[in-house]
Amino acid sequence: YYRDDFFRDADPKKMLVFSGWRFVPKAIALLTSHEAEQRIAPRGRLWEGDDRPPLRFTEKGSFHIFDVCLPSPALARLVEPSALASDALTAKELLRRTRKALKRALEEAGVQVAATSRSPIWQVVARLDRHSGSPIRKALEGSAAYNGDDITERFAEHVDTFVDWMEEGGSLRISEERLTHLARIAAFSPAVSILRAFWTTYPDSCGEVHERLVDLCFGELRSYFNRRTVRAIVERSVPAGRGYVRAAIEYCERAHFQAVADEYLYLVKNVLQRNGPAEMAEHLARVLGVGTGSPNIN
């Protein structure tokens, strides 16, 4: 949907291999993925026994996970990359448009943009979601993770805090720097991108958030980005010293995650006949949970 420096002026291309076979492509994919995993930093920090996944909830507060995993309708509405594809924007230009739309939405919600911040970034998003009439609270509180089948013992605590922020009044203030970061989340976060893909694939669900999508984003999607091989790929794609959450979002920007999600959901709906958001979320959960394992060949 936008031009970038990685592919430069090259047109996107696809290569179809063994299109008439059913078993062989899966076998090749399995073996190729296994070989690739063996070559991706088999030694080092990520493979040490005491390594901890970065997207984990702790008692100290872990709202940075929301950057990657919260499908916020208020953020998803700010921009529709597919609708801007004909404008031939760069990723930076798309980010600027998103930032402009976000700043306008913040002003309408009564959030001040200033030189410094005094409000947590997700408290600001909670205000945006409340102001826009977002159904995110119902989706969060209706998710299986929140109601007994908890992905972690801390997830429900974070949801309760977010809901409390939605109910609070008072003034909020966000800095220009955090405004840009939040615009990047709105444009490129995988969870927000998947939510937009659901809306374009199932137009009747536009503006809604299914509870199963919340479970998908905070469950299988979060686990996927916690995988050591995924982390190695993401961390290699950004400058050294970049925090993992920021790196994951920038990777989704470079990898055109929104376009990939839109096309994949379109194909799954129309080829595999996944007829609704709940069924699609279940399918994506299985896809994100697939691992290469240790294949044996007879």
Regions flagged by a language model, labelled:
Residues 1-298:
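Helicase motor interdomain insertion/brace
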